[in-house]
Amino acid sequence: MAWVTPNDFDGDSPLAGIDFQRALERKAYKEGAGLVPLQKYGDFKNNVKTTDLGTITTNIKGKYTLSNLNNIFPNFIVESLIEGIEAFGKRIEHFNDDDAVLSAIETRTSSPIRITRDENFNSNIKGLIPAGEGAGYAGGITSAAIDGMKIFEEIIKNYWV
């Protein structure tokens, strides 16, 4: 997974994150010519197109094509993915094998937008409190739970009599 912040893409629109996401999805579609683009991890690290699957095969459903995923992502995402895969490889045997198969692209691990809230967690409408992953304040179940706990504490403090 790669972390992307508003500083990583152009535009001041509240939907600029969605535009960035869609641009990556279009690149993946083009790279795969409508099929799922696949690449061996060793080829990904070396920025060369995969020409054959190695010792690790894929169980992906649907049609795929061998590709170069570097053509899809900006450099900061490529570097982040390599760093993350290498870190996992130190903990999980074979995770970073050169023949490991990568596919592209999953772009929805977290909300591409963030609903703004004030110091009391309210949106621009008092009492309407955006929270968790869908509101852009979490990236998974644990951080969403923590955000929910913060919101709950604020509600108790301000609304519980």
Regions found by a protein language model. Name each.
Residues K45, I85-I92, F152-Y159:
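Structural signal for hydrophobic packing residues in well-ordered secondary-structure cores
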